Regions:
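RNA/tRNA-interacting regions in translation and RNA-turnover enzymes
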Residues: 1-199
Length: 199
């Protein structure tokens, strides 16, 4: 039945076991997540997607962040999360999910960030709060800069790029790749989560 609804909506797809492989057209980027597809199906099944799933009373985060490139990033926000005690076993619940999507398992915060990206269609990036200062910025740079990536590689960024800088050093190639210096690990208990819309 769901397959028929997808065809009615113009979504070409194939079914393998219980997995829908979607063939989305370039103009339907809003459907590049589970939430986006459910939103398309909602009228057929009278599903209400308007309920809030977040805590409205959030304490303001004191962060000395400056956006020097509003033309390249129109909206950006940060949320700090601290976990007390041990992180419960969670990978069993995400094991098949990650396997089906060919996602590598890393650490708790990175795994949850990847999960949210596929579920909600909103990429996020996690910084280990103990490895980043309160003073960093988003800037467009044009000079060559060295960058130590999450993949343990040191590269030279050339040309015009949108980057997050801390003390003049690149800590994140915006929307592309995070840096090793502020990355999360299995020992991370406090993170700053970046959620941005890059134009």
């Amino acid at each position: 039945e769901i397959s028929e609804r997808f065809f009615q909506l113009g979504h070409e797809h194939e079914i393998e076991d219980e997995i829908f492989n979607m063939e989305l057209t370039p103009n339907r980027g809003d459907c590049l997540s589970l939430h986006g597809l459910v939103r398309d199906l909602a009228p057929f099944y009278e599903i209400d997607l308007t309920s809030d799933i977040y805590e409205k009373e959030l304490k303001e985060l004191e962060l000395g962040f400056v956006n020097h490139a509003p033309e390249a990033c129109s909206h950006i926000s940060f949320l700090k999360i601290e976990i007390e005690g041990e992180i419960a076993a969670y990978r069993g619940k995400l094991k098949e999910y990650f396997k089906d999507l060919s996602i590598n398992k890393n650490n708790f915060f990175t795994d949850i960030s990847n999960y949210i990206s596929y579920e909600m269609g909103q990429p996020t990036h996690c910084y280990d709060a103990k490895k980043i200062s309160n003073l960093f910025s988003l800037e467009i740079i044009e000079e060559d800069k060295k960058f130590h990536t999450l993949l343990e590689k040191e590269v030279v960024i050339k040309g015009r790029n949108l980057v997050f800088l801390e003390d003049g050093n690149v800590i994140n190639l915006a929307g592309v790749m995070g840096g090793k210096s502020t990355s999360c690990s299995t020992n991370t208990k406090s993170v700053i989560i970046e959620c941005a819309h890059f134009n």
